[in-house]
Amino acid sequence: MIGLVGKKVGMTRIFTEDGVSIPVTVIEIEANRVTQVKGLENDGYTAIQVTTGAKKASRVTKPAAGHFAKAGVEAGRGLWEFRTAEGAEFTVGQSINVDIFADVKKVDVTGTSKGKGFAGTVKRWNFRTQDATHGNSLSHRVPGSIGQNQTPGKVFKGKKMAGQLGNERVTVQSLDVVRVDAERNLLLVKGAVPGATGSDLIVKPAVKA
């Protein structure tokens, strides 16, 4: 089953009939419009390309404008692709709505995490701090040794060090679907999802469900 592109509206909570409070993230999923259908013959795999939302005509590049015009679809705020099973029937210009999640119990949500700027190893990688006293001065939050000796004579790739924290693609798996509001194009999932309010999210049925 394909996924959909939505926008993070924010977090709130809803109550069950027993009065239990459930923290939920509200995701607005406007109709996803199919802009291209890819097939085995021409592309080597099967997929659909979709767009959602709207973008000012002055902000759409000429190649993108031609692509949208060819599909007969209003220019959206981006293009996303979802792989499809062979034999799945989709047509260019078709709209796919949030109600495809009506029978789905768990979803995977992908977004871009909030950027935190340059961060040290304690904040970024949960390193322990060094001694506050006992002869330690000026080295309380430094990482310590980052290598060995003349052999190997280098710092290994992937070594956990200070640097940019956040602002990367993150997927949270197996979030419970609490409610599907097809009238208002809303999907409520239990818990938090990556990214800032207003950021784009990709919602797919959970692979581990």
Swiss-Prot record:
Task: List the NCBIfam families hit by this protein, alphabetically.
Answer: L3_bact
Q: Specify the species.
A: Erwinia tasmaniensis (strain DSM 17950 / CFBP 7177 / CIP 109463 / NCPPB 4357 / Et1/99)
Q: Which InterPro entries match?
A: Ribosomal_uL3 (IPR000597), Ribosomal_uL3_bac/org-type (IPR019927), Ribosomal_uL3_CS (IPR019926), Transl_B-barrel_sf (IPR009000)
Role noted for this protein: One of the primary rRNA binding proteins, it binds directly near the 3'-end of the 23S rRNA, where it nucleates assembly of the 50S subunit.
Q: Per UniProt, which keywords does this protein have?
A: Methylation, Ribonucleoprotein, Ribosomal protein, RNA-binding, rRNA-binding
**Family as reported in the entry's similarity comment:** Belongs to the universal ribosomal protein uL3 family.
GO cellular-component terms in the record?
cytosolic large ribosomal subunit
Q: Which GO terms describe its molecular function?
A: rRNA binding; structural constituent of ribosome
Pfam families (alphabetical): Ribosomal_L3
Entry-linked SUPFAM superfamilies:
Translation proteins
Gene3D superfamilies, per the entry: 3.30.160.810, Translation factors
Q: What is this protein called?
A: Large ribosomal subunit protein uL3
**PROSITE patterns this protein is in?**
RIBOSOMAL_L3
Quaternary state and partners of this protein? Answer: Part of the 50S ribosomal subunit. Forms a cluster with proteins L14 and L19.
